């Protein structure tokens, strides 16, 4: 399956001009007999170097080809359509201003708190476990939550596991986090998690992180491995811990406005292509992880990969976080992702 995904990506690289058009967008459907294509807006939170783009480009190219050009899709990276406001882009999707949308579950949880469930600390310990859960009951639960939030889930991919870097110490135990000033996502669960581990979590724009680390205003930060490398964070830190503490899925969705305008045949096509697109995206994400992990040797960086026993100590330390959010997430939903109280 991986070889197939890589082959698809190579083909996509050769098909750069797939989303040209720049029509009005946002007005899906239209007269089936019209020769003028309907241009749909697809918003992502990432630049075109990300694995998310591989999925977006696959979807755009396939839909245009299989509808004989009735639909063209323009991809907008870095949340251009919402002025960089990631939560705002979800709201624009709900309003039907954005037609198609890729965003991680972490940000979706600002709209529907239950969508934070798969991102909880040390919940799914391996990609094998992730695939079993996300291709099964966990993934179906997420799709239903998106549908209840004013959108239609077309597929689920991944940003991957989040790691941690800092300039103070090698992190091998919960005690090593004490007092560290760390940039974390501005999501309540993440802030509370790092406070519970004794750190000093702060929220700031990602664009400020590099300089803050360089100048000592921050001790460290966390992110997926590919972003820590591609955003050059590894240039200004001394220590990295690979601990796979939080898995972050990517949700690919359509607005209800677009969905209601499609024929039954088009809905089937969009669903099937969306699922395929996120398979391509996920394979690209895992290849990017392997490539970035190999690249760590190029940096003046001490890399610590935690053992199962070391991770067990962290799992024990974060149990209060699960208790804190038991009512918000629900015991049944936590169970879908492998956690029982």
How should these model regions be labeled?
Residues 125-145:
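A gly/proline- and charged-residue-enriched helix-loop-helix capping module
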Residues 1-5, 9-10:
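Positively charged n-region of N-terminal signal peptides that target proteins for export
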Residues 16-20:
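C-terminal motif of bacterial Sec signal peptides marking the signal peptidase cleavage site
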Residues 22-127, 147-341:
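N-terminal secretory/targeting leader peptides
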């Amino acid at each position: 399956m991986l070889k197939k995904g890589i082959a698809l990506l190579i083909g996509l690289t050769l098909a750069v001009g797939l989303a040209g058009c720049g029509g009005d967008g946002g007005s899906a459907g239209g007269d089936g007999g019209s020769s003028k294509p309907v241009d749909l807006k697809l918003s992502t939170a990432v630049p075109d170097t990300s694995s998310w783009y591989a999925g977006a480009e696959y979807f755009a190219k396939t839909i245009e080809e299989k509808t004989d050009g009735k639909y063209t899709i323009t991809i907008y990276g870095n949340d251009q359509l919402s002025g960089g406001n990631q939560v705002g882009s979800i709201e624009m999707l709900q309003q039907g201003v954005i037609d198609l949308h890729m965003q991680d579950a972490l940000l979706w949880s600002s709209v529907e708190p239950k969508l934070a469930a798969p991102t909880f600390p040390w919940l799914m310990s391996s990609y094998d476990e992730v695939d079993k859960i996300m291709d099964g009951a966990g993934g179906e639960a997420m799709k239903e939550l998106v549908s209840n939030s004013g959108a239609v889930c077309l597929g689920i991919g991944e940003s991957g596991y989040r790691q941690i870097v800092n300039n103070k110490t090698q992190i091998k135990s919960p005690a090593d986090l004490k007092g560290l000033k760390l940039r974390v996502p501005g999501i309540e669960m993440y802030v509370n998690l790092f406070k519970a581990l004794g750190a000093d979590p702060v929220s700031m724009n990602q664009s400020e992180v590099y300089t803050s680390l360089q100048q000592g205003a921050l001790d460290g930060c966390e992110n997926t491995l590919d972003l820590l490398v591609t955003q050059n964070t590894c240039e200004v830190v001394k220590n990295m811990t690979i601990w796979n503490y939080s898995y972050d899925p990517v949700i690919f969705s359509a607005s209800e406005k677009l969905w209601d305008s499609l024929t039954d045949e088009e809905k089937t096509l969009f669903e099937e292509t969306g699922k395929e697109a996120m398979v391509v995206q996920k394979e690209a994400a895992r290849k990017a992880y392997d490539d970035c992990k190999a690249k760590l040797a190029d940096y003046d960086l001490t890399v610590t990969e935690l053992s199962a026993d070391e991770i067990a100590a962290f799992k024990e330390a974060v149990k209060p976080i699960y208790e804190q959010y038991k009512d918000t997430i629900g015991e049944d939903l936590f169970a879908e992702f492998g956690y029982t109280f």
